């Protein structure tokens, strides 16, 4: 996606918004940095159950780890190897599919 840079709009950004322009330009990095520690905490939580799509807690935690791995890769990098792209795709697919199961 091409960035449209208007000097007036970027100079006064922080005066008009509650977050830095860099967090908006790199929204997926920002979201990944926000999501990773929460998924890690959720995985470590002594949960009372697991997503019904999985056979047990171990399998559910494995899926959560795949989500974590995907977001870890997306926290800072801009380019990815083919293996990293597959890891990201798999983790994001799991995150999307099981988003509403991320509760206890």
Indicate residue ranges for each PLM-predicted region:
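Long, non-globular targeting/processing and low-complexity regions
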Residues: 1-104
């Amino acid at each position: 996606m091409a960035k449209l840079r208007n000097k007036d709009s970027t100079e006064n950004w922080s005066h008009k918004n509650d977050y830095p322009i860099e967090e908006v330009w790199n929204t997926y990095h920002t979201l990944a940095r926000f999501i990773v520690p929460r998924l890690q905490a959720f995985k470590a939580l002594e949960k009372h159950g697991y997503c019904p799509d999985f056979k047990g807690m171990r399998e559910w935690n494995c899926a959560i780890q795949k989500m974590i791995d995907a977001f870890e890769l997306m926290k800072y990098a801009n380019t990815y190897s083919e293996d990293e792209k597959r890891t990201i795709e798999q983790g994001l697919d799991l995150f999307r599919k099981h988003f509403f199961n991320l509760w206890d």
